[in-house]
Regions:
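Ligand-binding loop in jelly-roll beta-barrel domains
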Residues: 97-123
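Short acidic-glycine-tyrosine-enriched beta hairpin
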Residues: 80-99
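Conserved short histidine dyad/triad with adjacent acidic residue
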Residues: 41-62, 97-98
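A short, N-terminal "cap"/entry segment at the start of jelly-roll beta-barrel domains
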Residues: 1-43, 51
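Glyoxalase I/VOC metalloenzyme domain signal
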Residues: 6, 46-48, 117-124
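Glycine- and acidic-residue-biased ligand/ion/polar-headgroup-sensing regions
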Residues: 37, 56-82
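Residue-level recognition of conserved beta-strand positions in structured domain cores
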Residues: 41, 80-82, 105, 115-116
Length: 124
């Protein structure tokens, strides 16, 4: 009798073929669901600002989604209503709490980041 070999299911996905895409002025948010987790890739062009380019779509001037992510390219700022402003740069791992905040691209280079937490609720 030949012993049975367990089957291992490996799933590979790419952001080039996302499960969902959310478009807005000067930006796009691509979502891939894998292993029960939704991961987002944000790509924002210079001049992008959450309160201007996403806010009107969701009916708010501030984002209220919690984020855990990694900056791949470009720079952005995240600002809270109490005056705190944080700069996000390539290689930065970031956690932004669900308190109201605005965000914008800094400089002339597109900003790209991965979002591991909050992606399914972002820009919705």
């Amino acid at each position: 009798m030949t012993p049975s070999i367990p089957t291992v299911a490996v799933v590979l996905k790419r952001f080039e073929t996302p499960d969902e895409v959310r478009h807005f002025t000067r930006g796009v948010f691509e979502l891939v669901t894998i292993g029960g987790m939704t991961i987002g890739r944000a790509t924002y062009q210079p001049g992008w600002r959450w309160s201007v380019d996403v806010g009107p779509t969701v009916g708010s001037d501030r984002c209220r989604v919690e984020h855990l992510g990694l900056v791949l390219q470009g720079r952005a700022a995240a600002a809270f209503d109490d005056g705190r402003v944080w700069e996000l740069t390539p290689g930065s791992l970031f956690h932004i709490p669900a308190e109201p905040h605005d965000s914008w691209v800094i400089g002339d280079e597109p900003y790209v980041s991965l979002h591991f937490l909050g992606a399914s609720h972002y820009a919705k």
